[in-house]
Amino acid sequence: MLVGVPKEIKNHEYRVAITPAGVVELIKNGHQVIVEKNAGIGSAISDSEYEKSGAKILGTADEIWAQADLILKVKEPIAVEYPKMRKGQIGRAHV
């Protein structure tokens, strides 16, 4: 499964849905992980840390939403993200 992590865009939300350690676990279990550029910056996690863990960094949230089978977010999607959702795509967020 291709797991995607877009940067959180809800007001005052600076966390990221997965740490590099979580990326390692997903990859160990046969998944691939894509992370939006600077998604972890609010949690003091650099793109290079994600890359070292095995994730691929993509430039935009649109790329993440278009490719991922599973979207991981901290908060629920907001209205501007609704059109990006695809039929059959799975979303996981803490609400």
Describe each region flagged by the PLM.
Residues 4, 25-42:
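Short internal beta-strands
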Residues 6-17:
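Short, glycine-rich nucleotide/cofactor-binding loops
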Residues 16-27:
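Histidine-anchored nucleotide/phosphate-binding helix
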Residues 34-57:
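N-terminal beta-loop-helix "entrance" segment that forms/cooperates
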Residues 54-67:
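Short acidic low-complexity segments
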Residues 69, 89:
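Conserved acidic residues
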Residues 83-88:
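Short, conserved loop/helix-junction motifs that constitute active-site signature segments
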Residues 93-95:
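Conserved small/polar residues in nucleotide/adenosyl-binding loops
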